[in-house]
Amino acid sequence: MQFICDAPGHKTWFRIDTEGEAALESAAMDHAVEKYFRQAWEAATGSYKPASGSFIERDIGLKSHIQRSMPIFLTLRNTEGGALATAMLPPGGQHDARFRIIIVGPENRDPYPDHEDAIRKLGEYFGLTLSRDRCYPYAGTRPSWK
């Protein structure tokens, strides 16, 4: 995981960089972020066009392509390392009106009542507005558990 920013209440946002980290997040939060991470990873690797046809040089640039192409997956952690919320932001953390930002708590519950200040801080870091009505997919409905 990669440190992104500190948040109020002794909380920290980290970027989920690998499928293994996504699997741990899914287990800790009892939701399906691993599935979405894997789908995004596969789509990004599938869209990669190497600059060279040489076998040896084929994958140079793949990692940076993946980081530019796939959504940013993040986890909010407390000081003990406990998972509090999971976020999926547009590729590069840049505004994209076509992209549905998702922020959920454990078991896809609403993270805003307990972590709104931390979510706001993440939005400030990326220059995004992360309002509940836009980012919590189950507002006004019962969450899907997986």
What is each residue range found by the language model?
Residues 1-146:
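Catalytic-core elements of nucleic-acid end-processing and repair enzymes
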